[in-house]
């Protein structure tokens, strides 16, 4: 825990590529060998922090949709993307490890894999509210939508250091436009209270 807290503090001041195991050890007042005892390398340490971000993403997805405000399927997309933008802008670990530029390929792979899982969860949320048609397989369109939005967020983070309202809006427009290729403008609402 002390090691993780040290990395969070370092991430507030530096990019991921500028942090070494030595820096982490110095920040938490431990011997470098102690840090290596817990994590074999810096990428492994970052990966463990990213796992915490993924847990947060899962919780966020469960909490961000206000059923009283869901009148059209695009409301779900807006609520999900708005929640993720707020999370990214307040979490340096997520911003720097997911949106930032670094050479840790394993982290990018883990993020893509998690988006595939999230895509299925997002689809279940949509189906909870609307009778949407069968979707193409094997790629989940909601996972693609999440990845597309992340690309815009990444551009914003790299240029401005955070996700600007303007680029958050662009990500929303892009993800919504993509989803409209598969989800009709008018979908029958599902009465899940009586189901």
Which sequence ranges carry the predicted segments?
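Amphipathic alpha-helical packing segments from all-alpha helical-bundle domains
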Residues: 78, 82, 86-87, 106-131, ...
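Hydrophobic/aromatic-rich alpha-helical bundle segments in the mid-to-C-terminal region
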Residues: 96, 128-175, 185-195
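Short hydrophobic clusters on alpha-helical segments that form packing/core surfaces
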Residues: 3-11, 53, 57, 84, ...
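Alpha-helical DNA-contacting segments of helix-turn-helix folds
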Residues: 11, 46-53, 98, 114, ...
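Amphipathic alpha-helical segments used for helix-helix packing
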Residues: 87-106, 151-157
């Amino acid at each position: 825990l002390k090691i993780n807290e040290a990395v969070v503090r370092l991430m507030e001041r530096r990019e991921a590529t500028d942090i070494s195991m030595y820096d982490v050890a110095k920040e938490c007042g431990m011997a470098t060998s102690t840090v290596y005892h817990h994590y074999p390398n810096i990428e492994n340490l970052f990966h463990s922090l990213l796992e915490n971000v993924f847990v947060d993403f899962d919780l966020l997805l469960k909490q961000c949709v206000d059923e009283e405000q869901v009148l059209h399927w695009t409301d779900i997309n807006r609520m999900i993307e708005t929640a993720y933008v707020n999370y990214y802008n307040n979490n340096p670990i997520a911003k720097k490890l997911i949106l930032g530029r670094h050479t840790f390929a394993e982290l990018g792979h883990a993020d893509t894999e998690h988006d595939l899982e999230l895509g299925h969860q997002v689809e279940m949320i949509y189906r909870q509210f609307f009778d949407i048609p069968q979707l193409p397989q094997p790629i989940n369109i909601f996972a693609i939508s999440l990845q597309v939005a992340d690309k815009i967020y990444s551009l914003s983070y790299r240029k401005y250091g955070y996700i600007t309202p303007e680029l958050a809006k662009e990500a929303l427009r892009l993800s919504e436009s993509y989803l409209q290729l598969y989800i009709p403008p008018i979908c029958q609402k599902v009465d899940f209270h009586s189901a």
